[in-house]
Amino acid sequence: MSKKTIYFLCTGNSCRSQMAEGWAKKHLGDEWNVYSAGIEAHGLNPNAVKAMREAGIDISEQTSDIIDPDILHNADLVITLCGDAADKCPMTPPHVKREHWGFDDPAKAEGTEEEKWAFFQRVRDEIGERIKRFAETGE
């Protein structure tokens, strides 16, 4: 059986979609080809790498990419992770299922360094739980 393709999209392919790609490779990698991209490519956020490493997942080799029309049009499932991506994502063909799983942007966290770091950890855990639920239930 060939693998299905899941494509995670957010604004800059820097934090949320990168963490989603890492979690999905862990929980869905046997059944899905996992990709992520952004409306723009802002580069991999070092705190996203650090947060995922803390959870035992290495995303340091992932790249920050803009949306690839070939992957977008051939994906089985496209998931937007922020309102900006949901609004600006290019049209997907009717056969491509599209869902929106909204998460706060950890790159916009304010406060002390500890508060910003806690924000990254929270969003990391929320994305991980959502992907784990999808892996277990298909929803």
UniProtKB/Swiss-Prot annotation:
Active-site residues, as the UniProt record annotates them: C10 (nucleophile), C82 (nucleophile), C89 (nucleophile)
Catalytic reaction(s) noted: arsenate + [thioredoxin]-dithiol + H(+) = arsenite + [thioredoxin]-disulfide + H2O
Q: Does the keyword Cytoplasm apply?
A: yes
The record's EC number reads: 1.20.4.4
A Pfam family this chain is assigned to: LMWPc
Sorted alphabetically, the Gene Ontology cellular component annotations on this record are:
cytoplasm
Q: What InterPro entries does the record tag this protein with? A: Arsenate_reductase_ArsC, Ptyr_pPase, Ptyr_pPase_sf
Disulfide-bonded cysteines: C10-C82, C82-C89
Q: Where in the cell is it found?
A: Cytoplasm
Keywords in UniProt for this one?
Arsenical resistance, Cytoplasm, Disulfide bond, Oxidoreductase, Redox-active center
Q: Which Gene3D superfamilies match?
A: 3.40.50.2300
Where does the protein principally reside? cytoplasm
Q: Name one GO molecular function term.
A: protein tyrosine phosphatase activity
The EC category is oxidoreductase
Gene Ontology annotations of biological process type = response to arsenic-containing substance
Which family is this sequence assigned to? Belongs to the low molecular weight phosphotyrosine protein phosphatase family. Thioredoxin-coupled ArsC subfamily.
Q: Which NCBIfam families match?
A: arsC_pI258_fam, PRK13530.1
As for what it does, the entry says: Catalyzes the reduction of arsenate [As(V)] to arsenite [As(III)].
User: What is the name listed in the Swiss-Prot or TrEMBL entry for this protein?
Assistant: Arsenate reductase
Q: Which organism is it from?
A: Bacillus licheniformis (strain ATCC 14580 / DSM 13 / JCM 2505 / CCUG 7422 / NBRC 12200 / NCIMB 9375 / NCTC 10341 / NRRL NRS-1264 / Gibson 46)
